[in-house]
Amino acid sequence: MHELSNLSLWHSTMTTEEWGPSRPGLGTDLDVDVAIVGAGYTGLWAAYYLLQRDPTLRVAVLEAQVVGFGASGRNGGWCSALLPMSLDAIAKQSSRAEAVAFQTAMHDTVGEVGRVVAAEAIQCDFAHGGYLNVARSEVQLQREREHIEHLHGYGFTDEDYRLLSRDETLERCAATDVVGGAFTPHCAAIHPARLARGLARTVERLGATIYEHTPVVEIRPRSVRTHLGTVRAEVVVRATEAFTPSLPGMRRSVAPVYSLMIATEPLPKAFWAQTGLHERATFNDGRHMIVYGQRTADDRFAFGGRGAWYHWGSRIKPQYDHSERVHGLIHEALREMFPAIGDAAITHRWGGAVAAPRDWWCHVQYDKASGLASAGGYVGDGVGTTNLSGRTLADLITGTATDLVALPWVGHRSRRWEPEPLRFIGINAMAFLPIGADRHEARHGTPSKWREAIMNQLIGH
């Protein structure tokens, strides 16, 4: 068993071969063309596409822990077309046409990830089964109906986003209290850690070098400083996501927000024959407090949710990965949706931080004059968006003129979060809004308009 197998279900189910040998840290000063800080999806996809564009590039990836240590190895395994910001927010900053172009690029991204994992023989349990949002009350169904109508107003059709009847939804997923649902084909279930580790092996085969156990202490134009040496590079890519606040001057750039997960033991075939999810569509329901799940390739439920506290000073610590209270609530939500799981064992409990910018906007940036580049701020929607950001970074850095470099997240800069204690008070107070909205809907059967308005205002929707 690998020493980090206890990080998550995904890490624990990798074989010794999939883990591979430990990579050494940086041992000396180094000169390269591109230095990438962070060996999660953002950094690895950037390295992959840079070397696709120009195989002669000298690319070094610096990782504080090991490949896939952060959210890239611990997430819910949704390779989706979801963006943290709404189409209206994108259109307001740019135009409706650019909002549609951005969302369409995300649709294409799911297929692009599937293409790469097939071409590079990355075994990550990729199943392009779509995403199902189950409405379990009339108010949830009405919200889904309005959302689908809104998307169709941008020119998308039932081929992209479709409202489902009760029977159609139950045929796909036999959760409790189903009244309808919504479906999009633009999502695939994956094994996150296998994707990260397989992608790392691929970029190494293409010529990149990955240095693990090499924390970066300072990023400057054309220079990255670590305690193990300095890397000089024409281009420096910051791909540090939730760990960004640990860098000098970046404390208020994003807020690390924790998302926690559980996994059941493998469930019997008779259970799945009754429950569905036969094509492994990712799923959630229409509540405001986010939950998310998938049927894994080995027939478990991997199920997660938000609700954990934000920690003072944007701190990230191993003990924050576990919360008896939140893990208990997640288990309760899963049993409420699928009571037939009965007393099935919960074999894994874990968590990790995602990066939330102040305006909920993800970004891609590149300044040719300084050689500094970055991408991130995915707020938990990073499995797909990291691929798009990796392609976009590669195009920007190599000067390749494509439609991607014109997408409205390129060059976007979010304002900084408020200083403490305002940040601590505000973010944790926000957590009560979806809880209150869900309770109001359960009691009254009507939406909590004022809570919804505040939530949308706070996250820029």
Model-assigned labels for residue ranges:
Residues M1-V34, Q52-R58, A453-I459:
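Extreme N-terminal leader/targeting segments of oxidoreductases
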Residues L82-R166:
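Dinucleotide-binding Rossmann-like beta1-alpha1 core, especially the glycine-rich loop
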Residues Q319, M337-A340, P357-C362, K368, ...:
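Helix-rich C-terminal "cap"/substrate-channel and partner-interaction subdomain
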